């Protein structure tokens, strides 16, 4: 199974703070609560393509 790099972007300010590797066959976008150093708080981060 091939892995691909995915960037997680903050839903508030839009900065791409995290990168992860995930399966290329996933159909849904990943959404997790992570700390954004630019906003200074935990915000929802979404997968970008």
Swiss-Prot record:
The protein's name is Large ribosomal subunit protein bL33A
Q: Which InterPro entries match?
A: Ribosomal_bL33 (IPR001705), Ribosomal_bL33_sf (IPR038584), Ribosomal_zn-bd (IPR011332)
Any one GO MF term held by the record is:
structural constituent of ribosome
Q: Does the keyword NAD apply?
A: no
Originating species: Levilactobacillus brevis (strain ATCC 367 / BCRC 12310 / CIP 105137 / JCM 1170 / LMG 11437 / NCIMB 947 / NCTC 947)
Tell me which UniProt keywords the record has, alphabetically: Ribonucleoprotein, Ribosomal protein
Q: Which GO terms describe its biological process?
A: translation
This protein's superkingdom? Bacteria
The record's listing under Pfam families reads: Ribosomal_L33
> What protein family does this chain belong to?
Belongs to the bacterial ribosomal protein bL33 family.
Q: Does the keyword Hydrolase apply?
A: no
Cross-referenced NCBIfam families, in alphabetical order? PRK00504.1, rpmG_bact
């Amino acid at each position: 199974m091939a892995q691909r790099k995915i960037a997680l972007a903050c839903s508030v300010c839009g900065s791409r703070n995290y990168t992860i590797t995930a399966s290329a066959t996933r159909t849904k976008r990943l959404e997790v609560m992570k700390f954004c150093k630019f906003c200074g708080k935990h915000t929802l981060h979404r997968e970008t393509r």
